[in-house]
Amino acid sequence: MLLAVDVGNTNIVFALFEGREIKSRWRVATDPRRTADEYAVWLLQLMQLQGFDPKVVKQILISTVVPRALHNLSVLAQKYFGLDPLIAGQPPVEWGFEADVDEPRSLGADRAVNAIAAHAKYPGDLIVVDFGTATTFDVVDFNGAYKGGIIAPGINLSLDALVNAAAKLPRIAIEAPTRTKSVIGRNTEDQMHIGVFWGYVAMMEGLIARMRAEIGRPAKVVATGGLAVLFGDHTDIFDHVDTDLTLDGLAILAERVTVQ
């Protein structure tokens, strides 16, 4: 079985695969100071609770956008699973697609993995939207080439900036406005919900419309990340909502290495 490790700026997701099927997954907050032993206590207990013997893991693949977290996760793989981990984007785990951008080496692992998975699962011209700490918009053409994209502040970052800079504004949850259907709020909290949520939807729809116009061909939109389902319920701009896209991309990469 494959243990895929997706290290984001906010969370780390561990997923256990049999082939391309996710058998289980576990999530922990990203903290580069966490030791290999601390990861092991947490992860091995969860695996055992669900009936998985660590010996079933034959391959570990790590994708990270937090370089400082890589060392201790590699030690975890070696010390507790007896495996040298594969690292996404490093030999022998090459991306296998053309990156038609100014600095291909600067492409984040998460975005590259998303591009691989999206092309495999949804053939054609694509825009991949990933709601994370930042919200990224990536263009993948019908040949699977990465053509560039957009990086925007994530909605939580936007809300944090608003609340931290305006002393009298309260902290609110990230959710669709429920107390009013109007976009003209009559109290502070409603106005904030409308501004944060519908403002983000408008930004997202506007950017996608501009990207589609520039691509010049019909492009399907694939949404992933923690808030994809929430936004997918309030816009028709998405063709697919796929919260497992990044993990599936890791399984595809691991499969390629096995075939080699």
From Swiss-Prot:
GO terms for cellular component: cytoplasm. The active site is at D110. It is found in: Cytoplasm. GO terms for biological process: coenzyme A biosynthetic process. Coiled coil: none annotated. A monovalent cation. Ammonium or potassium. Keywords: ATP-binding, Coenzyme A biosynthesis, Cytoplasm, Kinase, Metal-binding, Nucleotide-binding, Potassium, Transferase. It catalyses: (R)-pantothenate + ATP = (R)-4'-phosphopantothenate + ADP + H(+). InterPro entries: ATPase_NBD (IPR043129), Type_III_PanK (IPR004619). Its cofactor is NH4(+); K(+). Substrate binds at G108, A109, D110, R111, T188. One of its GO terms (molecular function) is ATP binding. The keyword Metal-binding applies. Its EC number is 2.7.1.33. It comes from the Bacteria. It is an enzyme of class 2 (transferase). ATP binds at D6, V7, G8, N9, T10, N11, I12, V13, T133. Gene3D superfamilies: 3.30.420.40. The keyword Kinase applies. Catalyzes the phosphorylation of pantothenate (Pan), the first step in CoA biosynthesis. Homodimer. Belongs to the type III pantothenate kinase family. This is Type III pantothenate kinase.
